[in-house]
């Protein structure tokens, strides 16, 4: 027992020795630190004295302008890339450089997108200027139905919306997918920007149903439809809002670009015409980006319809354009459509149900408009393009006017092809003789009139030279038909229903003139339409 106490005493004495040694070392460390602190304070005082002598010297005061220029140049250098710095310096001098730097600083504060940067699409100056010059437009609700959206695609989409130069918008995201991270990413953005809204759907109701859920969320006066993997140009909503505010548009659409991989890799630009009903009846050329007023949507029968899944946008656009007061086309590519395997941007034939739905949408459109049609079909080899056979309910006589001067073999080919291929029952041919010299020409005229006494006649123009307008105006005086067809004598009819195809358009009150596609002998196109304006 005594031995145990002695051992404990030895342990305690050993601990006391170590503690005393540690205390001594710490005391030495404190003494060294106090010495270093004293030296540092002395050095600081010396530096302050030296600095005072420098800043108070005449040299320092005389070189202040040079130091100011160097300082500002460093700021500009860090703000602008080298090539921009040199370009602005050469074109606008130091003032141009400063203006460019100011715009870029403002841009950095206004456009937070890190992945899909706004300045990848437009000059910084334009972006900043549009933010400062807000159109008096409506609140625009951008509806995006999400479905297992790849997160990198979603991040680009969100950046492209947040970076809009027009600020009066909201983003309505409805999510019917199961992929992890999608909802979290949108909700994280929504926590920073309350204009972004998210709703998790209980079930997938396909694109039409999911889109309609997003429209239900929307509080804006205008709706814009955005696919979940596509990208908006930063100026898209600004141009649309300007058209709405200044032109009273209730339906707006823009040009677009299709890209693969990175947005810079554009594989197709889709430059569209202004609104053309016949174009829309052939193909949904409107597509993206489209905005329409809520009032117009309600007047046209509501949002998208499930029975047209696959061509739900096409069916909606047909209804909206039937009712719209003012349709405006913005001729700028403001929408970037991502092409991926299986997407309609890549090939609509990948989704045959889209084609069937498109045909059904067209038939419903004609029924609403009171337009009689015999058939609507897909044009072979052109997925997404439809052909309408209108019912010919006003089949008047067609007077075919053919100015001719010798070249009798060409004329024979032309006339014989008309009689060989034409299935339209009521037509006449008027050959307008224009100073022919060859006797064979006149013998051929007599033979043709003898072979076709009921619907072929030859009239002789007394004028000189070749004046196509004057010749046809002269021939028209002898025409008995309701429709006039101007035909060159070196053409050949190759399609049986050629007159039916033109008459079914010409009979419509909104149509004044109809043209047919012309081919060269090697089947290349000679003429396929004329644009005005």
Segments and roles (model prediction):
Residues 1-136:
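Boundary detector for helix-to-coil junctions that initiate low-complexity/charged tails
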Residues 138-143, 170, 315, 396-401, ...:
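Cell-envelope/extracellular polymer assembly enzymes that use nucleotide-activated donors
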Residues 158-168, 416-426:
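Short, acidic, metal-binding catalytic loop of nucleotide-sugar glycosyltransferases
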Residues 167, 175-184, 203, 227, ...:
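A conserved acidic beta->alpha catalytic loop
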Residues 201-218, 461-479:
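Glycine-rich, basic loop-to-helix element that forms the pyrophosphate-binding segment
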Residues 223, 484:
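Short aromatic/hydrophobic "clamp" motif used to bind/position activated sugar donors
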Residues 231, 235-266, 491-533:
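Conserved donor NDP-sugar-binding/catalytic core segment of glycosyltransferases
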Residues 276-363:
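Conserved nucleotide-sugar donor-binding catalytic segment
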């Amino acid at each position: 027992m005594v031995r145990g106490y002695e051992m404990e005493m030895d342990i305690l004495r050993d601990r006391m020795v170590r503690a005393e040694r540690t205390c001594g070392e710490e005391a030495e460390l404190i003494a060294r630190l106090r010495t270093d602190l004293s030296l540092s304070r002395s050095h600081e005082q010396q530096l302050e004295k030296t600095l005072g002598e420098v800043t108070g010297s005449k040299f320092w005061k005389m070189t202040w302008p040079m130091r100011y220029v160097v300082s500002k140049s460093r700021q500009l250098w860090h703000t602008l890339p080298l090539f921009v710095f040199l370009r602005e310096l050469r074109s606008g001098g130091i003032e141009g450089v400063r203006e460019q730097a100011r715009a870029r600083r403002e841009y950095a504060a206004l456009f937070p997108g890190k992945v899909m940067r706004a300045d990848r699409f437009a000059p910084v100056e334009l972006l900043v200027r549009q933010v400062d010059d807000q159109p008096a437009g409506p609140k625009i609700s951008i509806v995006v139905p999400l479905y297992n959206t790849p997160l990198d695609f979603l991040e680009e989409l969100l950046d492209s919306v947040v970076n809009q130069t027009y600020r009066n918008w909201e983003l309505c995201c409805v999510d019917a997918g199961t992929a992890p991270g999608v909802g979290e990413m949108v909700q994280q953005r929504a926590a920073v920007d309350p204009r972004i809204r998210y709703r998790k759907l209980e079930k997938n109701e396909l694109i039409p149903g999911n889109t309609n859920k997003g429209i239900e969320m929307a509080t804006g006066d205008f709706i814009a439809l955005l696919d979940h993997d596509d990208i908006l140009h930063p100026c898209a909503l600004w141009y649309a809002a300007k058209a709405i505010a200044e032109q009273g548009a209730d339906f707006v659409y823009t040009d677009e670009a299709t890209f693969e991989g990175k947005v810079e890799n554009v594989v197709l630009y889709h430059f569209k015409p202004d609104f053309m009903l016949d174009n829309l009846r052939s193909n949904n050329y409107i597509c993206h980006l489209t905005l329409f007023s809520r009032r117009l949507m309600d007047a046209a029968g509501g949002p998208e319809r499930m029975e047209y899944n696959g061509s739900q946008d096409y069916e909606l656009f047909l209804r909206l354009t039937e009712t719209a007061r003012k349709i405006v086309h913005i001729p700028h590519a403001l929408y970037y459509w991502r092409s991926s395997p299986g997407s309609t941007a890549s090939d609509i034939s990948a989704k045959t149900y889209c084609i069937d739905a498109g045909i059904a949408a067209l038939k419903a459109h004609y029924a609403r408009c009171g337009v009689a049609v015999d058939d609507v079909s897909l044009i072979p080899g052109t997925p997404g393009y439809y052909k309408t056979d209108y019912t010919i309910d006003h089949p008047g006589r067609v007077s075919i006017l053919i100015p001719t001067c010798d070249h009798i073999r060409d004329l024979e080919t032309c006339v014989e092809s008309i009689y060989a291929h034409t299935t339209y029952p009521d037509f006449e041919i008027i050959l307008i003789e224009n100073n022919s010299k060859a006797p064979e020409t006149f013998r051929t005229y007599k033979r043709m009139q003898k072979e076709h006494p009921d619907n072929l006649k030859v009239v002789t123009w007394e004028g000189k030279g070749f004046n196509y307008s004057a010749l046809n105006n002269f021939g028209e005086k002898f025409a008995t038909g309701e429709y006039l067809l101007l035909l060159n004598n070196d053409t050949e009819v190759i399609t049986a229903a050629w007159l039916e195809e033109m008459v079914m358009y010409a009979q419509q009150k909104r149509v004044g003139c109809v043209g047919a596609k012309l081919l060269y002998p090697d089947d290349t196109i000679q003429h396929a339409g004329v644009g005005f304006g």
